[in-house]
Structure formats: C-alpha cells, structure tokens
C-alpha cells in the first residue's frame, strides 16, 4: 500500500465495469504481468493515509484472507484520490442468474452456497459481518468459484450498537432491520443468504418488496405471521413503530421453491427464521445434511484466470452447460434439474429472464416439470431485470410525489355529477411527525399534511351545496378509507 507509486505506471485502464454510491470500478491490466484486475476509484477525497486506512473496507479486507473473499491486492492514493486494486472476477451472481435459460442443477447451487458460507464463517470468526449480502456482491468465475465482495458496509461484531438502520438491499433485508432494530448482528447475513439461496433455485427474488412495509408484507405472505412467543423482540420493535403484524397463514415453501431437496429446504428455512437468535450461524450451517454428499465442494485450486485467457461469458457458460448435459443425457447417467433429449440437443436461447415476476400460481406455484424456461420473442438486447423493475412507476394511492411541489386530484360527486379539481402544494422537507410515522406504517404520505390551494368546481348547480356534504378540506375518493380523517380525530 503506497502513495509513491503512480497508477498509470503500473496499470492500464481498459473499460468501465460499473458505478456505485461510493465509487466507480474499472477493468485494468497490470503492465508488468498482464494480470487483469478490478480497480475501484473512490469518489470521496482522502487527504492523508490515516484517513484512508480508517475506512471500514480497508480495515476488514486487510484482515480477511480467504479463498472465498475477494482479495484486496493494494491501495494507491494519488492526488488525494484513493484506488483499491482487487483481483478480477468474471461476473457477479446476479449476472450469472439473469443469463440462464434453465434452472441450475442442485449440485451447482449447493457448491455456491457452500463457498459463500465458507467465506461468511471466516469473516464472522474474525469479528466482521457484511451487512450488504446480495447477488451483486458475490463475484463469480462461472459456477465453480464464488467470492464475497464489497465490504463498504462491513462492521466489526464487537463494535457497540446502535448501528445505522439503513443497510442491505431491501429484497435481502432481515426483518429486524425492516423493523428498525439498531442492535442487529451477523444473523442478518444468514437471512440474506437464505433469500439468495431461494433465488438460485427459482431465478427471481423471493421477496421483491417495493417499499420497506411492502417488504415486510411479502415476507409475511410467504413465511406467515411470526409467533409472539417465538420472537417477542420483533413485536416490541413493531409496536415501537406503530406496526401491527397481519394474521397470515404461511404458504408452503414447497409451492414457492419447488425444485429444492428436503435437506436444502431445511437449511434455507432455518436461515430465514424470524428470530435472529434462532438462525444457524455459518459454521453450523456447513454441518447440515444438505452438504453431506458424495461430491467435492469448495473453491477450485486455481482461482485467478490466466493473464491471456479470454473471458468466458455467462452466455458461453450456458452453452457449455448445454453441451455437457446433452452428452450426459445420451449416456443416461445424468441426474439434475435439466431434462435434455439426446436426439434433440437443447437449443440455447439468448433471452432475458424476468426475475421480478409476481409470486403467484402462474409463476412460482406451478410444479416444475424440468423444462427449459422458454424463449423470448426477440433476440434484441434488452435491459436487465433490475433496470426494468426500477423504471416502473411506483405510484401509491394518496402519496404526495417527492419530485413535484403540486399535485392535482380530481373527485366526482356521484349525486350531482360535478367534478372538483383540487391542487395540493406540499413541501419535500419538513414533514410532520404524524406524516413520517404514517409513511413508515403504510408506505405513503397522507394528504392531510398538504396545503390546499385554488379549488375549482365545474358544472355547479343550485342544489350542489345541499347534496355535497364534504367540507373544502376533505376529498371524496370512492373505495378508499379516509385515513386522514381517522388520524386527526
């Protein structure tokens, strides 16, 4: 780790791989050896080495040297800009899943989960937990080698709470975090891995919530309402934020993840127990029967691709998988989740899997018949599932837009046929405590905090005021509960 070495003297930047909140990542080649590396350029400026070395990511990665944890090769500070030089991996787990045209064999999923657990066990043993486990933060060289990456949110287990409550991507966020706990610990990594494990089987997120409250509702709709005796702390957290658990019967997980073995189901469900204290830790998880199989598990001996090797893309990986499955099917000794006829080799379809389909009987609850996932209508380049998902409108009835200062609401009086257009002007900042709590509990901001301006009434009649009993500050919206009126009583 040095500030005297110039980046341009040692590395040749080739292309941009991605951009995040804290920095951008570039693909580069080491000039003297030809090795490919990933260089993360931090957006924040660092004016001393002491400041740079105090970063959580540096502190954790300096202590964590493991085959299933991404290796930090060096740190370079140049012109007050900090560069992290990491070993290069071909892709992340999300990219590996979205390029699939068929389900993974369970043996492949088992090996991926085994390697992630090995990395987590080492991390937790050395006093750190990740806090942001998700498919994008698990780097891959095909399905053979996986490594945990992005330790920007990592925490020391022995550090004292309270912690910041906004951690981890929502779809993989543990319920204690959704309920605003500030004393969580390493079990949140186990919950996230349980969600990732389910996603590897069904190739779409298990709990794709659109907000924090919707995330909780989606978890409850599948796992059922937690028992108060089973998790009393959860009910205390819910009460503190004015949230009430809906009484819902659990959906049989066999209907949701229907290609998993009994041993895999046991591990996955235990990692997603409501009570964090009852979830197995990483070491305990590695001793489950799911991993007691007659096959080699773990990282291969060679973890870094040869300097001059050509990157094997996900599409190429799918083609290789198809060829191998066809050959094995011809010998009648292949056991897996794919069913390929030796007379008609499986055709690899360049398609994009919609991993964000709703969880219903037409998508997940159907029984798997081991068929490929099917083609799309076009081979044109398509946006990723996450881009499609995030681009959709997140309109919630009654919500005041964060991007506009004025909203118009049209209401119709059913008795007179008159139409009233009301313009509300609301500030982005300075929400009342009532509005804030309401947003936490229900996922939208009630309109009673907005200032009403310029009401206009069309088609007025003489008997309009007699038939319309609404006050000027109330709105008629058929089919909706007037939460505002209830709240201000």
From Swiss-Prot:
**Location of the Protein kinase domain:** 11-291
Which residues are recorded as binding ATP?
17-25, 40
Stated EC number for the protein is: 2.7.11.1
Where is the region Disordered? 366-385, 452-489
Provide the free-text tissue specificity comment from this protein's UniProt record.
Expressed in head neurons including amphid and labial sensory neurons and 3 pairs of neurons in the tail including phasmid sensory neurons. In male, expressed in the tail including the sensory rays and the spicule.
- State where composition is biased (Low complexity): 458-473
The GO cellular component terms are: axon; cilium; cytoplasm; dendrite; neuronal cell body; non-motile cilium; nucleus; perikaryon
Q: Which keywords are on file for this protein? A: ATP-binding, Cell projection, Cilium, Cilium biogenesis/degradation, Kinase, Magnesium, Metal-binding, Nucleotide-binding, Serine/threonine-protein kinase, Transferase
The question of whether Chloroplast is a record keyword is answered with no
Keyword check for tRNA processing: no
Catalyzed reactions: L-seryl-[protein] + ATP = O-phospho-L-seryl-[protein] + ADP + H(+); L-threonyl-[protein] + ATP = O-phospho-L-threonyl-[protein] + ADP + H(+)
Alphabetized Pfam families for the sequence:
Pkinase
Mutant phenotype after disruption? Sensory neuron cilia are longer, not correctly aligned in the amphid channel, more dispersed, misdirected and sometimes turned back towards the transition zone. Abnormal localization of kap-1 along the full cilia length. Abnormal accumulation in the middle of cilia and in the distal segment and reduced speed along the cilium axoneme of components of the IFT machinery kap-1, osm-3, xbx-1, che-11 and osm-5. In a kap-1 mutant background, 30 percent of mutants have branched cilia. In a kap-1 and osm-3 double mutant background, loss of cilia formation.
Biological process (GO) annotations?
cilium assembly; intracellular signal transduction; intraciliary anterograde transport; intraciliary transport; negative regulation of non-motile cilium assembly; non-motile cilium assembly; positive regulation of non-motile cilium assembly; protein localization
Enzyme kind, highest EC tier: transferase
> Subcellular location, in the record's words?
Perikaryon; Cell projection, Dendrite; Cell projection, Axon; Cell projection, Cilium
**An MF annotation (GO) of this entry:** metal ion binding
The protein's required cofactor(s) are namely: Mg(2+)
Per the entry, what this protein does is:
Serine/threonine-protein kinase which is required for ciliogenesis. Regulates the length and the morphology of sensory neuron cilia. In addition, plays a role in the anterograde intraflagellar transport (IFT) in the cilia by regulating the undocking of kinesin-II motor complex (composed of klp-11, klp-20 and kap-1) before reaching the distal segment and the docking of kinesin motor osm-3 onto IFT cargos.
Family listed: Belongs to the protein kinase superfamily. CMGC Ser/Thr protein kinase family. RCK subfamily.
Q: What protein is this chain from?
A: Serine/threonine-protein kinase dyf-5
What gene name does this entry carry?
A: dyf-5
């Amino acid at each position: 780790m040095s500030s005297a070495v110039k980046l341009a003297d040692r590395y040749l930047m080739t292309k941009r791989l991605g951009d995040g909140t804290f920095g951008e990542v570039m693909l580069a080649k080491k000039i003297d050896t030809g090795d490919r590396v990933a260089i993360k350029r931090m957006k924040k400026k660092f004016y001393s080495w002491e400041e740079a070395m105090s970063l959580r990511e540096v502190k954790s990665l300096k202590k964590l040297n493991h085959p299933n944890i991404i290796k930090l090769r060096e740190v370079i500070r140049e012109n007050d800009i900090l560069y992290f030089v990491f070993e290069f991996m071909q892709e992340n787990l999300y990219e590996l899943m979205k390029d699939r045209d068929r389900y993974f064999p369970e043996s492949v999923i088992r090996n991926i989960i085994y390697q992630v657990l090995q990395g987590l066990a080492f991390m937790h043993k050395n006093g750190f937990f990740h806090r942001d486990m998700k498919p994008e933060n698990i780097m891959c060289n095909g399905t053979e080698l996986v490594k945990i990456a992005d330790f920007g949110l990592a925490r020391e287990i022995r550090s004292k709470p309270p912690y910041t409550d906004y951690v981890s991507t929502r779809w993989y966020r543990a319920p204690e975090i959704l309920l605003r706990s500030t004393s969580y610990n390493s079990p949140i990594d186990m919950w996230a891995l349980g969600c990732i494990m389910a996603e590897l089987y069904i190739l779409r997120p298990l709990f794709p919530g659109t907000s924090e409250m919707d995330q909780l509702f989606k978890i409850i709709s599948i796992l059922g309402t937690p028992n108060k005796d089973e998790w009393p702390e959860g009910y205390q957290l819910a009460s503190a934020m004015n949230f009430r658990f809906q009484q819902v019967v659990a959906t049989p997980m066999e209907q949701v993840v229907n290609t998993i073995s009994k041993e895999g189901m046991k591990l996955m469900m235990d990692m997603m127990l409501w009570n964090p204290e009852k979830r197995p830790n990483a070491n305990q998880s590695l001793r489950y029967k799911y991993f007691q199989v007659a096959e080699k598990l773990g990282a291969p001996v060679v973890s870094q691709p040869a300097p001059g090797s050509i990157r094997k893309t996900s599409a190429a990986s799918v083609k290789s998988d198809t060829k191998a499955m066809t050959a094995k099917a011809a010998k009648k000794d292949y056991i897996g989740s794919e069913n390929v006829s030796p007379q008609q080799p499986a055709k690899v379809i360049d398609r994009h899997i919609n991993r964000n389909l709703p969880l219903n009987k037409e998508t997940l609850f159907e029984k798997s018949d081991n068929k490929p996932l099917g083609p799309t209508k076009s081979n044109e380049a398509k946006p990723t599932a996450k881009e499609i998902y995030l681009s959709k409108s997140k309109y919630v009835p009654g919500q005041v837009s964060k991007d506009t200062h004025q909203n118009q609401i049209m209401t119709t009086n059913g008795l007179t046929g008159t139409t009233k257009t009301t313009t509300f002007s609301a500030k982005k900042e300075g929400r009342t405590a009532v509005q804030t709590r309401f947003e936490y509990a229900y996922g939208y901001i009630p309109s009673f905090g907005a200032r009403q301006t310029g009401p206009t009434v069309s088609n007025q009649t003489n008997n309009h005021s007699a038939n319309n009993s609404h006050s000027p500050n109330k709105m008629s919206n058929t089919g909706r509960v007037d939460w505002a009126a209830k709240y201000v009583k």
